[in-house]
Amino acid sequence: MHARVVSMEIRPMDIEEANRIYQDLVVPAAKEERGFRGALLLTDPYTGEGVSISLWESEDDLHASEASGFYHRKLDQLDALFIGTPVRKHYEVSVQEV
């Protein structure tokens, strides 16, 4: 399993709106992508710091979601709420317990 981790800063007054967009638009669309296995959005309502973690069955599935434009379309939906540019990294999931 592989993870895309996106670190971001959101204006604290916009955290609730970011949560709504992620829950109502980003996650349902991600469920339609091949290999999608789950997502988390972690936010600090005081500082505006946030981390999005999406889980993918394989590295190929993760990269396919970027090549298809899915990742950038979803990022664009949140763009007006960001301070600065989000930082994206990829990881192999070493341990998972749910």
Q: What are these regions, as identified by a protein language model?
A:
Residues 1-50, 57-69, 81-98:
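Short S/T/G/P-rich N-terminal loop/turn motif that feeds into the first structured element of a domain
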Residues 73-77:
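Low-complexity, intrinsically disordered Gly/Pro/Thr-rich segments
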